[in-house]
């Protein structure tokens, strides 16, 4: 899967998560606060407020995640990063939605506010984290197996650079580097010739990065 395909997968997962959490909240409020029964939940889909929220809220979450940089480097994401970013964006986003959409609702007691806030918070965090972890875990496995990688350039070609590359190649889990070649740091270090192409000297750095679409640079 290319970078755009991976971003699209995250966008779809985030939309589904936002729609699911909004649906959960709407059904919960209908049943618990409006004297409906659980068997009446399909009637929620006929409510214009539900449809309006379904159109707006997923877009709001896309914006939150975009501002947090959660679509920028899809191949560099990992599970700890997902947990951290999903947690703080959920806390902030739910508070915004609470004050924008729920605070003016007619209620019997403030417990209803707390209940609605809890349902939205837990629901959105759970759905979003689950969807993202599925994608991220699959991506990490693909990278560690060597199936997916990102173009990498090495700056330096001396014995220290050779040792660095040998250490990287000896890792049990593939780090995702696809070495396209190396740039000579001082114009004379060519020890890396045995591992990868010599792409020239430092004055060609910018041209090499562009022509080989380099995403990672290792200074060795």
Listing of model-derived features with the role each one plays in the protein:
Residues 1-148, 215:
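Signature of alpha-helical transmembrane segments in polytopic membrane proteins
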Residues 44, 135-220:
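A solvent-exposed beta-alpha-beta segment
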């Amino acid at each position: 899967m290319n970078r755009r395909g991976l971003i699209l997968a995250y966008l779809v997962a985030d939309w589904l998560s936002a729609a699911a959490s909004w649906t959960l909240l709407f059904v919960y409020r209908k049943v618990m606060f409006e004297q409906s029964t659980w068997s009446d939940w399909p009637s929620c889909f006929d409510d214009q407020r539900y449809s309006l929220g379904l159109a707006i809220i997923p877009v709001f979450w896309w914006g939150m995640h975009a501002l947090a940089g959660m679509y920028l480097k899809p191949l560099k994401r990992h599970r700890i990063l997902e947990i951290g970013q999903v947690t703080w964006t959920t806390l902030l986003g739910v508070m915004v939605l609470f004050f924008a959409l729920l605070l003016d609702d007619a209620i019997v007691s403030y417990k209803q506010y707390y209940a609605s806030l809890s349902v939205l918070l837990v629901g959105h965090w759970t759905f979003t984290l689950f969807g993202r972890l599925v994608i991220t875990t699959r991506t990490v496995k693909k990278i560690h197996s060597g199936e997916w990688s990102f173009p990498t350039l090495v700056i330096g070609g001396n014995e220290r650079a050779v040792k660095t590359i040998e250490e990287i190649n000896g890792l049990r889990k593939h780090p995702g580097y696809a070495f396209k070649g190396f740039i000579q740091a001082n114009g004379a270090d060519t020890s890396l010739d045995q591992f990868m192409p010599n792409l020239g000297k430092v004055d060609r750095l910018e041209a090499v990065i562009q022509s080989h679409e380099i995403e990672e640079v290792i200074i060795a």
